[in-house]
From Swiss-Prot:
PANTHER family: ALDEHYDE DEHYDROGENASE
Membrane topology: Peripheral membrane protein
InterPro entries the record matches: Ald_Oxase/Xan_DH_a/b, AldOxase/xan_DH_MoCoBD1, AldOxase/xan_DH_MoCoBD2, AldOxase/xan_DH_Mopterin-bd_sf, N-heterocyclic_Hydroxylase, OxRdtase_Mopterin-bd_su_IorB, TAT_signal
Keywords: Cell inner membrane, Cell membrane, Membrane, Oxidoreductase, PQQ, Signal
The protein's name: Membrane-bound aldehyde dehydrogenase [pyrroloquinoline-quinone]
Reactions it catalyzes: an aldehyde + a quinone + H2O = a quinol + a carboxylate + H(+)
Gene3D superfamilies referenced in this protein's UniProt entry, alphabetically: Aldehyde oxidase/xanthine dehydrogenase, a/b hammerhead, Aldehyde oxidase/xanthine dehydrogenase, molybdopterin binding domain
Enzyme Commission number(s): 1.2.5.2
Molecular function, one GO term: aldehyde dehydrogenase (quinone) activity
Post-translational modification: Predicted to be exported by the Tat system. The position of the signal peptide cleavage has been experimentally proven.
Length: 773
C-alpha cells in the first residue's frame, strides 16, 4: 500500500475501558519495556501481553496507559483528540506526577481505535475531569511497581526507598526506571481493593501538576512541521474525491448526472452515487480524480439534477416559530426540574416577568475542513481522519459498509480545529463507501470550505421563554424556564441522553445551563425538541453547546429582574446563590455548589472595582456568571465585560473582558489560560460578529466573504484569573464561552439603556433599540 504518513509522538501503544474505577491494574514486563494498565477485576491475577493487532473480541484485554522503555523513555497513551488544546500534555502531567517521572523523558502517543480503549470521545470539556482519578491511580501503581522492583535490585525493601524524577534511591544507592526495566522483571497485578488503598500524593507534593514552567510536549512537532493532521494523510495510488452536495441535508434524490464537461478536465476519473445504508449521507455524488485540484474542477463541472427533500423551502424563522409553538403547547417536552408549587406560584403571583430570548444558527468553521482517507487492507477498512468521537462513528461506518464493526479501524491524527464539528464523523462515510465501490482502493475525500459549511452540523437556532413570579412583597416565588432547539444527542447518540424527572429521555446538551444554581423558589425546567430543525439539518455540538445560548437567556433575564427590583446585578445574584438544597453541591465534582459560584462573583467584584469605576459616556460594564458545562461537573465562571456603544452607528466595541474561574485544580496553567482565552473570544464572536441564517433549507453563508467571525482587530484586552483550589479539576475548553455573551448584552443595557434579547447583537438592532427608546 506504500508508506503512510501518520501522526505519532512516541512509541505505539494502547489505552482504556469504560467503568475505570472497577478495574484492577497490571504491571508486566513485555518485550523491551514495561507496560502499565487497568484490567477487569475478574482477571486481575493474570498478566496479558499487549495486543498490537487489529481489534479483537475484547475478552480479558488489559487497558494500557503507559510504558517505560529500557532507556527510561516513558510513553503515555492518549485516547483524547488533540485539536490545539494540548490535552496530551495535561493528561501526561497527571500520570507522570503521580509516578514521580522525569518530565524530560515523557512522550505522548495518540492511539487508534480498538475495543480495549472503551469510550473514545473528546468533548463536553470532559477530558481532564474524566481522566483525573484513573490516571492518578495509574501513576501511583506504576510508582509502586518501580519502587518494589527497584528495592529488590538495590538489595533493600520498598519502605526504605524514595523516588523522584524516575530515580529510586535507598541507602546511598540509586537506580533509574530505565535500568529497573532493563535489569529487572517488574510484574505486579493490583486488585481494585489494592488500587483504592494506594497512597496518592497530596497537592503540596506535586511537581508537574500546576507547574507553570513546563512546556507542552507537542509544541516542537507543531512548530517544525512534523506534526501530521488528518488532511496530510496519504498513501500511494490513492484517488482524490470531492462531494457534489444535494440541495437538502435529507431526502434529496439524484435524478440525473451529466459528466460531459468533467471528462474534459485532465485527471478526472469518474463519479460515484453514494448509497448509504445508514442514511446519514443522502443524495451525495462523489467525484474522483488523480489530484485534488482536478477533483475540485471536475466537481464544479459536473451537472447533477436532484429531487429535493421536503425542507427545501424551510427558513430560520420557520424553525424558530416551530420552537415557539412547542413552548406554547403545555403538552410534550421533558422536565429536568419540576418542583411542586410552580403553577400555584404563578397563579397567585402579584407580578410576573415573562421574556423570550432567541439565538441564531452558528457554524463551526474550523480551520481544517473535514476530510478522510479510506481503504481496505487485509479485509479491514482503515479510515484515516481527525475525529472527536471515534466510538460514535465506528458503528455507523460498519453499518454503511455493511461489515462487522471489528472490520473497521479509525487511525488518529491531529485536528486542525474541532470545536464539536468532528464529534460528528459523517464526513468519513462517503470516503469509505467510495473506497468500497472501487474494491477497497484508497480514496482521499476532502470537502472544500463551501462544502463543509453547507452540511456542517451547526448549532441549532433556539428559543427560550423565561418567566418569574413575585409575591406582593416582590419576593421571588417561582421560575419557569423552557427552551426549544434541535437535539444533537437525540439525532446522533440517543443512548447518551439522560432521563428527566418524568422519566423521559432528553438531550442534556440542548438544555444544560437552564438548570442553574440560583435559589428561585419553585423551579421548573422544560426541554423541547424542535423536530423541524432536525428534519432540516443535522444539529451538532458546537463549543459550549447549550450553555452557550441558555446562559444568554438566564443571565440577561436575571439582570432584567435586578434592574426591575432596583438592585445591583452582582449583589442580586449573591442573594440567590445560597448553596441550599439541590444547589449545595456534592463531592467530588461540585463541592461547595453555589457558594463557590458566589465566591467567584465576590472576587471579581473586587478585581474590577465593581460599581465604583467611573467610565466615559455610553461605556459600561456588564456581568454574567455561569457554572458550565453541566451541573454534574461545574466550572464556576464570572465575566465582566466593558463595552462602548456608538449611538450614531449602533456598533458595539468590547474594550475588555475580565474573567475569573474556579475550575478546581489547574493541571496545566498555560493550557488552562489559553483554553479560557479561546473560549472567551469564541463567546465574543458569537454575540457580536458571528451567525448564519437558514434559507431554503441550507445555511446561507458558505465562506468568509459573508461569514464574519471575530477578527484580530476586534479582540479586546483580556484579564483572566484562576482561583486557587485543590478540588478535583473541572473542564476548561468551553465554560469561558458561556459568560461572555450575556455579560456583553448586560453591558450594552448599562451603557445606553437598550435591552436586546436576540443573539447575535447587530448594529441595526442597537439602532432600532435606541430609536424605540
Amino acid at each position: 500500500m506504500g508508506r503512510l504518513n501518520r501522526f505519532r509522538l512516541g512509541k505505539d501503544g494502547r489505552r482504556e475501558q469504560a467503568s475505570l474505577s472497577r478495574r484492577g491494574f497490571l504491571v508486566t514486563s513485555l518485550g523491551a519495556g514495561v507496560m502499565f494498565g487497568f484490567a477487569r477485576p475478574s482477571s486481575a491475577n493474570q498478566i496479558f501481553p499487549l495486543d498490537r493487532s487489529l481489534p479483537g473480541d475484547g475478552a480479558f484485554e488489559p487497558t494500557i496507559w503507559c510504558s517505560i522503555a529500557p532507556d527510561g523513555e516513558i510513553t503515555v497513551n492518549i485516547i483524547r483528540a488533540e485539536m490545539g488544546q494540548h490535552i496530551g500534555t495535561a493528561l501526561a502531567r497527571i500520570i507522570a506526577d503521580e509516578m514521580e517521572a522525569d518530565w524530560s523523558k515523557v512522550r505522548i502517543n495518540y492511539v487508534d481505535t480498538d475495543p480495549k480503549w472503551g469510550l473514545m470521545v473528546t468533548g463536553g470539556s470532559w477530558s481532564v475531569w474524566m481522566t483525573w482519578d484513573v490516571f492518578r491511580q495509574a501513576g501511583a501503581a506504576t510508582r509502586t511497581a518501580m519502587v518494589e522492583e527497584g528495592a529488590r535490585l538495590l538489595g533493600t525493601t520498598p519502605d526504605k526507598c524514595t523516588v523522584a524524577s524516575s530515580i529510586v534511591s535507598a541507602g546511598g544507592k540509586q537506580i533509574s526506571f530505565g535500568d529497573i526495566v532493563a535489569k529487572g522483571h517488574p510484574s505486579h497485578a493490583f486488585t481494585p481493593e489494592e488500587m483504592a488503598k494506594l497512597p496518592l500524593k497530596p497537592a503540596s507534593e506535586r511537581r508537574l501538576i500546576g507547574n507553570a514552567e513546563l512546556k507542552a510536549l507537542d509544541i516542537p512537532a507543531k512548530t517544525n512541521g512534523t506534526a501530521i493532521y488528518g488532511i496530510d494523510a496519504k498513501v500511494e495510488g490513492m484517488l482524490y474525491g470531492r462531494p457534489k452536495m444535494p440541495p437538502t441535508r435529507y431526502g434529496s434524490k439524484v435524478r440525473s448526472v451529466d459528466d460531459t464537461e468533467a471528462k474534459k478536465i485532465k485527471g478526472y476519473v469518474r463519479y460515484l452515487l453514494i448509497d448509504d445504508p445508514s442514511q446519514v449521507v443522502q443524495g451525495w455524488v462523489v467525484v474522483l480524480a488523480e489530484s485534488y485540484s482536478a477533483a475540485i474542477r471536475a466537481t464544479d463541472a459536473l451537472k447533477v439534477e436532484w429531487t429535493p427533500g421536503e425542507t427545501i423551502h424551510t427558513s430560520e424563522r420557520d424553525i424558530q416559530d416551530r420552537g415557539r409553538e412547542l413552548i406554547n403547547n403545555k403538552a410534550g417536552g421533558v422536565y429536568i426540574f419540576n418542583d411542586d408549587g410552580v403553577d400555584q406560584a404563578f397563579g397567585s403571583a402579584h407580578t410576573v416577568m415573562d421574556q423570550e430570548y432567541t439565538c441564531a444558527s452558528v457554524l463551526h468553521y474550523q480551520l481544517e475542513p473535514t476530510n478522510a482517507l479510506a481503504f481496505e487492507k487485509d479485509g479491514v477498512y482503515e479510515i484515516h481522519a481527525g475525529n472527536q468521537w471515534q466510538s460514535l462513528i465506528l458503528p455507523t461506518l460498519a453499518k454503511s459498509l455493511q461489515v462487522p464493526e471489528s472490520k473497521v479501524i479509525l487511525r488518529s491524527y491531529l485536528l486542525g480545529g474541532g470545536f464539536g464539528r468532528r464529534l460528528n464523523g459523517d464526513y468519513m462515510i462517503p470516503a469509505a463507501l467510495a473506497s468500497k465501490a472501487l474494491g477497497g482502493k484508497p480514496v482521499k475525500l476532502i470537502l472544500t470550505r463551501s462544502d463543509d459549511m453547507q452540511f456542517d452540523s451547526f448549532r441549532s437556532p433556539s428559543v427560550q421563554r423565561v418567566r418569574m413570579a413575585f409575591d406582593a412583597s416582590d419576593r421571588i416565588t417561582a421560575m419557569d424556564y423552557q427552551a426549544a432547539a434541535g437535539w444533537p444527542t437525540g439525532v446522533m447518540a440517543e443512548a447518551f441522553m439522560e432521563k428527566g424527572v418524568d422519566g423521559k429521555p432528553y438531550d442534556q446538551f440542548a438544555i444544560a445551563g437552564g438548570d442553574h444554581w440560583y435559589e428561585v423558589g419553585a423551579f421548573r425546567v422544560r426541554a423541547l425538541r424542535n423536530d423541524l430543525a432536525e428534519k432540516t439539518f443535522r444539529p451538532g455540538w458546537l463549543r459550549s453547546v447549550s450553555p452557550g445560548w441558555t446562559s444568554w437567556g438566564v443571565e440577561c433575564f436575571l439582570d432584567e429582574v435586578a434592574h426591575r427590583q432596583k438592585k445591583d446585578p452582582a449583589q442580586f445574584r449573591l442573594e440567590l446563590l445560597t448553596g441550599q438544597g439541590r444547589n449545595k453541591g456534592q463531592a467530588p465534582d461540585s463541592v461547595g455548589g453555589a457558594l463557590r459560584q458566589a465566591a467567584v462573583v465576590r472576587r471579581l467584584m473586587e478585581k474590577v472595582n465593581w460599581g465604583k469605576t467611573s467610565l466615559p459616556k455610553d461605556t459600561a460594564m456588564g456581568l454574567a456568571t455561569t457554572a458550565g458545562q453541566e451541573r454534574g461537573m461545574p466550572t464556576w465562571d464570572r465575566c465582566v465585560a466593558q463595552v462602548h456603544v456608538d449611538r450614531s452607528t449602533g456598533v458595539v466595541t468590547c474594550q475588555k473582558l475580565t474573567i475569573l474561574v474556579d475550575a478546581g485544580t489547574v493541571v496545566d496553567p498555560d493550557g488552562a489560560k489559553a483554553q479560557t482565552e479561546g473560549a472567551a473570544l469564541w463567546g465574543l464572536s458569537m454575540v457580536l460578529f458571528e451567525n448564519t441564517e437558514i434559507v431554503n433549507g441550507m445555511p446561507v453563508d458558505r465562506n468568509l466573504n459573508t461569514y464574519t467571525p471575530l477578527r484580530i482587530a476586534d479582540t479586546p484586552e483580556m484579564d483572566i484569573e484562576f482561583l486557587p483550589s485543590t478540588e478535583k479539576p473541572m473542564g476548561l475548553g468551553e465554560p469561558g464561552t458561556t459568560v461572555v455573551g450575556p455579560a456583553i448584552g448586560n453591558a450594552i443595557f448599562n451603557a445606553v439603556g437598550v435591552r436586546l434579547r436576540h443573539m447575535p447583537v447587530r448594529p441595526a438592532d442597537v439602532l432600532r433599540g435606541l430609536q424605540n427608546g
